[in-house]
Amino acid sequence: MAETSEEVAVLVQRVVKDITNAFRRNPHIDEIGLIPCPEARYNRSPIVLVENKLGVESWCVKFLLPYVHNKLLLYRTRKQWLNRDELIDVTCTLLLLNPDFTTAWNVRKELILSGTLNPIKDLHLGKLALTKFPKSPETWIHRRWVLQQLIQETSLPSFVTKGNLGTIPTERAQRLIQEEMEVCGEAAGRYPSNYNAWSHRIWVLQHLAKLDVKILLDELSSTKHWASMHVSDHSGFHYRQFLLKSLISQTVIDSSVMEQNPLRSEPALVPPKDEEAAVSTEEPRINLPHLLEEEVEFSTDLIDSYPGHETLWCHRRHIFYLQHHLNAGSQLSQAMEVDGLNDSSKQGYSQETKRLKRTPVPDSLGLEMEHRFIDQVLSTCRNVEQARFASAYRKWLVTLSQ
């Protein structure tokens, strides 16, 4: 075991080199982790590489982390010089152990801007860090910065024009979107209600996918099973609410464009060889009422199957809110603050009541069906929390219709 500063320096340099060599031997490493090992029992490297998994024996972290941390700070204060390769290796090791060290990410930003570091490699490093620290805010922030650099490259446009079909994601953009969705999904599975992961997923839809309708529909479909397996995950259900609201907003925008420019609805002349491609890229037609009805049925099944989960009742409020505005033909630019009335805050209650009264009166049929659903739940449930949430939902509906 190393004791003197010289021995620690030799040990750490060897470990950093072993980590670098591990990535060179296997560039497809997809997960990192700590191996519980209080002491160094054998005279061997504490870095273990098995297939695509990289492990670090825990005994060396107390030497490794302070050393690389101090080394980078000395570089930033111009008290010690590090060449580019050393910077890449030191920041890589540091971020795998502590991904919320902002200075290390900033150094790598400088390396990317100078052309020394491939931004794709930084996406991979961030993905690895998220397998151990799935909620790391600095990692998600840096990831968005890297993606912005990629989509801003003039030689790599994110979207291409397809005649009257508007713009669709390029193959490169589609690949990036798919990879980011996978990273977000893995992080959300590792940490419950991972707000940072779901927020990043929304950012990807807004900035990479440009709220493409087909991608929004695919996301709504692909996250349905996940939501049914994580019925207490507020962030996951908020994501579905974002998808539904975005689909409604995009449909409203498209309808308004069609009204202003009727020629847009005329079919474009497509060469025979491009007909198949045009069909495959044409935006699907959306039946919004049917889409929301399906979400109501999904909500009903979950509430019946998993009683006592507040997340499910909050989600149902949002669905009814969207149906309510869609049926009334109202714009969805208003804030969706429908998480309930806070009895302990009189001011909050007053503001919520005023906001709800500004909205159109909900259709009587939909409101009646919701009250029937609440009556059915209250008459059959034995769960105290379920009854409380159902009563709160009824109170919200009454306030909405006043």
From Swiss-Prot:
SUPFAM superfamilies: Protein prenylyltransferase (SSF48439)
InterPro entries cross-referenced by the UniProt entry: Prenyl_trans_a (IPR002088)
Modified-residue entries (N-acetylalanine), positions: A2
Keywords for this protein: Acetylation, Prenyltransferase, Repeat, Transferase
Gene name as annotated: PTAR1
Organism of this sequence: Homo sapiens
PROSITE patterns in UniProt: PFTA
Coiled coil: none
Recorded GO MF terms: protein prenyltransferase activity
UniProt keyword annotation of Zinc present: no
A GO CC annotation given for this chain: mitochondrion
Gene3D superfamilies attached to this UniProt entry: Protein prenylyltransferase
Family: Belongs to the protein prenyltransferase subunit alpha family.
Extent of the PFTA repeats: 87-120, 122-155, 180-213, 219-252, 295-328
Renumbered residue ranges of the record's region Disordered: 263-282
Name the UniProt record assigns to this protein: Protein prenyltransferase alpha subunit repeat-containing protein 1
